[in-house]
């Protein structure tokens, strides 16, 4: 039923893309609820639909355009936001779907709300008490993404994110701490710290000092993590470049303040290709840093992502990448075949790699990594670990995660049937076996 004279206006929402986009969606949804809008999960009952898009690679662009088209077909009133909305100042989306009501870029909640207000005025008497203090979230209650900055100062040749989200803009640390405290009070037991470049947090603010609860707090990733570590929940860091000052986080991991886990987007192992990517090209220094991290924190889990088939990548470059992979022994790895992104400087680099070769290299890469992952997971068999219940599967089977695994992108711990457990519970388990991706265990104590 659509909104009438006495019914609140209803908004449908489709959120695509990365965790940073998820946080943008949550902020918009929270404000909509505060203004009295109802949020619905189907096109038929919505008065207007918002589609938060991704535009990073071709597959994401296609998915976003399809989602916009479906929303137009099923509902007819659509507001588009997100990274794809920033392409060509919105003309790219309008060219494909001229009937959309409005197009905005990422991190533009105000513009999205203005477009919704124009199409569907808010109720005159919003009940702000309908919104929980931690806001509305798209993740399960037991974990939450905590975005600490917008934009990026890097100029990687394969990426157009800076042109979409702009230069680095760090949030004030006291603002982040207030949000984190509200999330924990609302039931979050894990905070996943995200940004485009987490280690660069505070550079734009010149690391100025703020105050939280009367205590000084520097706008610096080490100080922020130390403060988050006092909240008594898992704190997991994503999108961390291997800057030298990341070494300062290791004592916090050793003390149990933050998880011994780093998501480090390395992208390649060949200095020549790294230079073409406009990434730090000293792969041997990165390898030394990884080995140093592991000496300081033996339980450290390192996740990374790589690109194969980058323009100009030769067999020798790919062999260097595999050598790097074997030497680094990373725990969790994702690999993508290079996909040209409209507007990226890498498109002008000569030596395009044929698609079949890209896929062959990707398969070879993942075969090497699978053996490494299997071996590293096997070392945990026989250990006792504290895990977080993530989901209940068919037949009462329990799916959990250890401190080594981020939601959705890493592995899980399969526990079989375990009576009395609920999503969000902590439980101690004994690891009984492992494969290349997941662990298997039995409950020791809840």
Swiss-Prot record:
Any one Gene Ontology molecular-function term assigned to this protein's record: metal ion binding
Cofactor note: Binds 2 [4Fe-4S] clusters. One cluster is coordinated with 3 cysteines and an exchangeable S-adenosyl-L-methionine.
GO-annotated biological processes: tRNA modification
GO CC annotations, alphabetized: cytosol
Database matches in Gene3D superfamilies: Methylthiotransferase, N-terminal domain (3.40.50.12160), Nucleic acid-binding proteins (2.40.50.140), tm_1862 like domain (3.80.30.20)
Keyword NADP: no
Domain MTTase N-terminal stretches: 9-121
The reaction(s) this protein catalyses: L-aspartate(89)-[ribosomal protein uS12]-hydrogen + (sulfur carrier)-SH + AH2 + 2 S-adenosyl-L-methionine = 3-methylsulfanyl-L-aspartate(89)-[ribosomal protein uS12]-hydrogen + (sulfur carrier)-H + 5'-deoxyadenosine + L-methionine + A + S-adenosyl-L-homocysteine + 2 H(+)
Main location group: cytoplasm
Sequence similarity: Belongs to the methylthiotransferase family. RimO subfamily.
Protein name, UniProt field: Ribosomal protein uS12 methylthiotransferase RimO
Organism annotation: Acidithiobacillus ferrooxidans (strain ATCC 23270 / DSM 14882 / CIP 104768 / NCIMB 8455) (Ferrobacillus ferrooxidans (strain ATCC 23270))
Gene designation per UniProt: rimO
């Amino acid at each position: 039923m659509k909104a009438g004279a006495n019914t609140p206006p209803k908004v449908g929402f489709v959120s695509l893309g990365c965790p940073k986009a998820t946080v943008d969606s949550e902020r918009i949804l929270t404000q909509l609820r505060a203004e009295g809008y109802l949020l619905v999960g189907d096109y038929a009952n919505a008065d207007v639909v918002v589609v938060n898009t991704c535009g990073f690679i071709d597959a994401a662009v296609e998915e976003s355009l399809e989602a916009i088209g479906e929303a137009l077909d099923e509902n007819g009133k659509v507001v588009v936001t997100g990274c794809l909305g920033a392409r060509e100042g919105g003309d790219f989306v309008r060219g494909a779907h001229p009937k959309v009501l409005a197009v905005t870029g990422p991190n533009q909640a105000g513009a999205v709300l203005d477009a919704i207000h124009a199409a569907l005025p808010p109720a005159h008497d919003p009940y702000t008490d309908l919104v929980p203090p931690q806001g509305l979230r798209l993740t399960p209650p037991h974990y939450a993404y905590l975005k600490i900055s917008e934009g990026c100062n890097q100029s990687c040749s394969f990426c157009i994110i800076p042109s979409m989200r702009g230069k680095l803009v760090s949030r004030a640390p006291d603002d982040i701490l207030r949000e984190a405290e509200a999330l924990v009070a609302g039931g979050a037991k894990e905070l996943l710290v995200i940004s485009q470049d987490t280690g660069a947090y505070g550079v734009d603010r010149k690391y100025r000092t703020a105050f939280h609860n009367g205590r000084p707090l520097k706008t610096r990733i080490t100080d922020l993590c130390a403060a988050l570590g006092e909240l008594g929940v898992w704190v997991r860091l994503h999108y961390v470049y291997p800057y030298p000052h990341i070494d300062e986080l290791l004592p916090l991991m050793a003390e149990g303040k933050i998880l011994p886990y780093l998501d480090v987007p390395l992208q390649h192992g060949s200095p020549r290709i790294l230079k073409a990517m406009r990434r730090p090209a000293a792969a041997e220094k990165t390898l030394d840093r990884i080995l140093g991290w592991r000496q300081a924190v033996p339980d450290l889990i390192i996740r990374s992502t790589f690109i194969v088939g980058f323009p100009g990548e030769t067999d020798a470059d790919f062999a260097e990448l595999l050598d790097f992979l074997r030497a680094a022994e990373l725990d969790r790895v994702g690999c993508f075949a290079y996909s040209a992104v409209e507007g990226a400087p890498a498109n002008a680099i000569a030596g395009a790699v044929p698609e079949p070769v890209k896929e062959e290299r990707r398969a070879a890469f993942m075969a090497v990594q699978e053996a490494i992952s299997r071996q590293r997971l096997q070392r945990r068999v026989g250990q006792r670990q504290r895990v977080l219940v993530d989901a209940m599967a068919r037949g009462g089977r329990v799916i959990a995660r250890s401190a080594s695994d981020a939601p959705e992108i890493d592995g899980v711990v399969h526990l079989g049937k375990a009576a009395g457990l609920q999503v969000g519970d902590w439980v101690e388990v004994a690891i009984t076996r492992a494969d290349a991706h997941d662990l298997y265990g039995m409950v020791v104590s809840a």
